[in-house]
Amino acid sequence: MARNSGFPCAGTVASHGRNIHGASRTFVVNDREGRVYGYYAMAAGAVSYQAATRSVRRNMPDPVPVMVLARLAVDHRAQGIKLGAALLQDAVNRAVAVSQNAGVRALLVHALHDGAKQFYEHYGFQESPQHPMTLMLRLNTVRA
């Protein structure tokens, strides 16, 4: 179920309950006065072999372990300054760090609308063969 949750962003923010009992971690960009301009949340997860992209599922068990980008939002006042791209890069860097120490294959996101899907595709995410709004980025393709 999507809801605005009081955060003035360009789109809606999905509430999936992923932070119940510490199941996710949220990372926030704010100014000195505490005004939030953007945030994202990440959680551990898995994707079925059939729903994974070919490159993600290759030589992996079923289900395939992933990091889930549960939310990413930018305040409408911070639109146009590439804050979303910076937040995404930080999330990718954190997921890569996890993948170097644990068996995590990809970063997975559920895009809420076509604009969000295009944003993630621009940064190399690929569409799930079963769920067009589920996108994945194989982490070893972004390692330095």
Please report, for each region that a protein language model flagged, where it lies by residue.
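Non-catalytic substrate-recognition and accessory regions of acyl/acetyltransferase enzymes
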Residues: 1-81, 85-144
